[in-house]
């Protein structure tokens, strides 16, 4: 009976020790870095980047993240100084700087006016993901005065 108690206590002690070793071997990821499959996305837009270029005081800035595991692109675009309210916002691809391409997705206008915001999430196809990661996606904001686009910005990614 005493032998049974010794083995039982030794068994439970080994389980507790194993658990303690497991927990102590885990490393807390508190360095602020994103996962290996998450990329920061950004892009500044101006009329000079449109093709052909347009004269406007409007500008825009895109920021967000792209997760290559889920193919989800979370974005926020803020613009100021447009000639009027935005009529449409799109991502376009495949295109390098200065080259035009067709729209690949419409973006939601959250707050509209000469100053405004577009915020949302889009799911990219594998082909669109390749365009994004190779710097071949741009966004542009259309207005009544500039139906083909008043400001344009190339989207760049960086893995963190």
Question: What spans do the regions from the language model cover?
Answer:
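Bacterial Sec-dependent N-terminal signal peptides
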Residues: 2-3, 18-42
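Short, exposed beta-strand-loop hairpins at the edges of beta-sheets
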Residues: 129-131, 137-154
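Solvent-exposed serine/threonine-rich low-complexity stretches and specific carbohydrate-binding patches
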Residues: 104-112
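Divalent metal-coordination and catalytic microenvironments
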Residues: 62, 89-93, 139-141
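Acidic glycine-/aspartate-rich tracts in secreted/extracellular proteins
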Residues: 81-83, 94-99, 144-146
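Transition segment at domain starts
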Residues: 32-68
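Bacterial N-terminal signal peptides that target proteins for export
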Residues: 2-13
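Aromatic sugar-binding surface patches on proteins
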Residues: 71, 114-123
């Amino acid at each position: 009976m005493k032998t049974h108690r010794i083995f039982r206590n030794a068994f439970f002690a080994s389980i507790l020790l194993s658990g303690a070793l497991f927990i102590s071997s885990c490393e807390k990821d508190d360095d602020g870095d994103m996962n290996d499959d998450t990329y920061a996305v950004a892009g500044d837009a101006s009329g000079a980047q449109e093709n052909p270029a347009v004269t406007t005081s409007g500008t825009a800035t895109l920021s967000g993240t792209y997760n290559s595991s889920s193919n989800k692109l979370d974005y926020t675009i803020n613009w100021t100084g447009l000639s009027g309210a935005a009529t449409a916002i799109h991502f376009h691809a495949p295109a390098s700087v200065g080259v035009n391409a067709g729209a690949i997705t419409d973006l939601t206008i959250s707050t509209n006016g000469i100053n405004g915001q577009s915020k949302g999430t889009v799911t990219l196809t594998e082909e669109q993901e390749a365009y994004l990661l190779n710097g071949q996606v741009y966004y542009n904001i259309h207005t009544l005065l500039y139906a083909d686009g008043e400001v344009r910005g190339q989207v760049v990614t960086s893995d963190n």
